[in-house]
Amino acid sequence: MPSIRAPAAKKTTTLTVAVKCRPLMEKERGRDIVRVNNSKEVVVLDPDLSKDYLDRIQNRTKEKKYCFDHAFGPESTNKNVYRSMSSVISSVVHGLNATVFAYGSTGSGKTYTMVGTRSDPGLMVLSLNTIFDMIKSDKSSDEFEVTCSYLEVYNEVIYDLLEKSSGHLELREDPEQGIVVAGLRSIKVHSADRILELLNLGNSRRKTESTEMNGTSSRSHAVLEIAVKRRQKNQNQVMRGKLALVDLAGSERAAETNNGGQKLRDGANINRSLLALANCINALGKQHKKGLAYVPYRNSKLTRILKDGLSGNSQTVMVATISPADSQYHHTVNTLKYADRAKEIKTHIQKNIGTIDTHMSDYQRMIDNLQSEVSQLKTQLAEKESQLSIKPFERGVERELSWLDGLSHQISENVQDRINLQKALFELEETNLRNRTELQHLDDAIAKQATEKDVVEALSSRRQVILDNIRDNDEAGVNYQRDIEENEKHRCELQDMLNEAINNNGNKTYLHILNQYKLLGMGNTELQFEMAMRDQIIYNQREAQRNLWNLLMGLGVEEKQVFDLAAKQGITIEDWSSIALFPGLPYRKQTPSFIPANIPFVGHSYSKSSCTFQSYQDPSSKGQQWAPTPTLCREEHHSSYYFMRQEPPAFVNLRKSHDGWVGGSRPASRIDTGGNHRRVSYPQTVNNSSPRMASGPTFYQTPQREMLLNTTSPYSSPRVGLINGATTPSVQPFYGSPRAVTVRNGSYNTPLAPAAVSTKGARNQQRVFGTSPLSGTKGVKNSSYGQNSHTKLYRGGGTKGHSKGNNTQRQHQ
């Protein structure tokens, strides 16, 4: 595992927005309508000069005024623009991230600003010179390493501009590095001239076309990334900085460019990705004024690449380029409108500091990637050699295989799109859940402050904002559902194509196997996605518990004070650190005053090799019968715990002790005559402060859905006890850690009715009951692995049980 030092405190900063107006070109027959005042204010005049006197005196004009961090007129050069952001570029050498991107319509001067010419070099060239000048002038003994990569996004497909024949590249999410492009070539460089050579090489491979709006229009988005590693010679420390320079393609209108065919499709894809970027800027800008809002990063690959630059760990500069011509009034105003909203976006920056272990792990990763690349090249070479010796009559088979490969690629893209849509829908629902929680808190606050009009008005205003966000998110969710339905229709079409190929081709066995393989691959990918989502939720819940406990300890609050205060509020806190006071003995063994005479002592041990908790009974306990030992099983790939036993579960009894409410077990009353129903006794009196159980025998109906220990006695005679004051044996959780704390806050105002359990067939078949951390997630199922039985949990509490094979039915009131 790489070793990472605790990062320094995060610093919150806003986007730096600069506006550059290009000069008026000779072919533009019109007047200049843009004015730059005091290097900060931009005024766009009304392009219509024919308005009558009444319109002018009534101030009905299209004139617009904006203020930005920096504003540059037509006479400014790229060096003037660069001086305003040079401090951001220099911070890359000291372990910080920086992003610079140009935004504007086609022909407004984005590529000129970023790349420039020999006489007026652009921001990319000037940034590279600054980085290497700082490395050369550094007087410390630190070692520097600079790498460069260059990619383009063309028609929502990523290509490597440093590779002669680059294939399609995919985006991946790395837990340490964030969004990365799999297979992107990164070249080690030692001077700015070398990077300029690579930049010119990449620009020669970049997609450009001539349109009526721009003679050299960029048809793709380009991202030049410079990574700087700084290693201190006498210390075990590495700092990593990253500079991303982005040249976006310009938005365009089909009516103005008169494009057709491929150019028209390219323009549509460019506008689509820029619209996704504009929506992200709008959502991020709203968060400063209206609070929590969903940001649709997944709508485009461009926005996913720029995610860190827009809201992550990066200092970001946005250069908005505009045209002064009156014919470009609408494009100019739209660009300035989005630039004005971008001023509200905030990012959180911190130094990227690691240790030498991280440095060495990067080399190991590079070695693994090179070995994988060598293996792929060998495979491709073998395929090429076999193709050279192919016979003419086999070319038909080759065409069929090529068609199958293309169909396979479409299936993979269909599955990946579905996963992305499901992820986006999941994030949207999570955002709405937090909004509804805040809405509930606002309603409670309004009810408490009914007499304070000013406070109620402020809370009501905030409540309306939250309702608007919920409504917007619901509309976005409907759109995602529609996209998922269209994706499913496309999947059915692909399936029909495969079935048709199977019916029309003579080699039906091979095609049928291929079809099944692709379908299994699709199902496996979706299952991996569901598992990843559930693991993420488990991790978030555990982090929340750990942070809560660390917060209490950091404030100097003692555990006894926490327990006393929680007991007064009706909250139960179980400290799992007191599970085993003495090794080898269960907790109940060490409290003899609470032990009934005929209940054996049961302990639990964990086997790391088999990933199971094995229960055992103390042979010195009173009693003459031995019950089958239950087992607590953990499925490695599900990270969930399942309690396995031979008997049906009895209810969990609760008692009130000095530590609050704890669980106790009572045996179920049973009538074991053949064919008769078994009866399970549930408590008839429950205190209001005790947690409420859900309809299943092993579930709490609380927001946390924590699993409570549920055991049965091997003896047939029931012991009747009271809830309050009964001296029942305390039951501790199966697994414990010194810092693990479970907080439950539940209430139950009505008595629980008796529950009947009827069985048919075999009595002692093994059954499994379990819970999942995903019980609150819509559409995600939880299966307990046992003999023909499983349990599903749904949002809002409650369970739905299904059983197969043993005809078991449960009825609960």
Curated annotation (Swiss-Prot):
GO terms for cellular component: microtubule. GO terms for molecular function: ATP binding; microtubule binding; microtubule motor activity. Belongs to the TRAFAC class myosin-kinesin ATPase superfamily. Kinesin family. KIN-8 subfamily. Residues 349-391 form a coiled coil. Keywords: ATP-binding, Coiled coil, Microtubule, Motor protein, Nucleotide-binding. Pfam families: Kinesin. It comes from Arabidopsis thaliana. Residues 682-694, 761-791, 804-813 have a biased composition (Polar residues). InterPro entries: Kinesin-like_fam (IPR027640), Kinesin_motor_CS (IPR019821), Kinesin_motor_dom (IPR001752), Kinesin_motor_dom_sf (IPR036961), P-loop_NTPase (IPR027417). This is Kinesin-like protein KIN-8B.
